[in-house]
Amino acid sequence: MRFPQPHRNGGETQQHFHSTISLQKLKRFNSLILVFRFSAFCFSLASAVFMLTNSRGSDSFHWYNFDAFRYVFAANAIVAVYSLFEMTAAVWEISRNATLFPEVCQVWFDFGHDQVFAYLLLSANSTGTEMARTMKDACTDNKPFCVQSDIAIALGFVGFLFLGVSSLFSGFRVVCFIINGSRFYV
């Protein structure tokens, strides 16, 4: 259920008119956000799984022996869980035409968490990239370990791109909420 927002100077609330075309545009916009959130989930989960399964033999390298790779795994796993929650919220919003939380909370929750987790992912994957670059000399003996680490980091960067686009959309919704008193631009 949408809660109408009062005007800033205490006046009456404004009721928004939504035509059938407007509702179709809103569903398309929400579906587009869902696609980007699903993509961020898939790539972050794949990155976490690639890093988690990156161990070769008992005497060679293990991902958990390197702080940077543990950071890559943890950040991608956290973003995968967050993206799963946001996909659930997006499906709820598409199916019921209402947000999971009150509208003001949902708009700021989405935007704030998208920003925090996007920067977390960028930071973790940048740290992992530096570790992988530093290890290039040691990779002559453990080539599969290094290749799988590179793949996990690359998947994490792609997950960051999709989460960044989701953050742009949620930022657009915040601006619409500030201007119109509703998360919709119509």
Swiss-Prot record:
Tagged with keyword ATP-binding: no
One of the Pfam families matching this protein, by short name: CASP_dom
Segments traversing the membrane: 32-52, 72-92, 104-124, 151-171
Alphabetical list of InterPro entries matching this protein: CASP_dom
Extracellular face residues: 53-71, 125-150
UniProt keyword terms in alphabetical order: Cell membrane, Glycoprotein, Membrane, Transmembrane, Transmembrane helix
GO terms for cellular component: plasma membrane
Compartments where found: Cell membrane
Cytoplasmic side: 1-31, 93-103, 172-186
Topology in the lipid bilayer: Multi-pass membrane protein
Residues with attached carbohydrate: 125
Recorded family membership: Belongs to the Casparian strip membrane proteins (CASP) family.
Subunit structure, interactors included: Homodimer and heterodimers.
Record protein name field: CASP-like protein 4C1
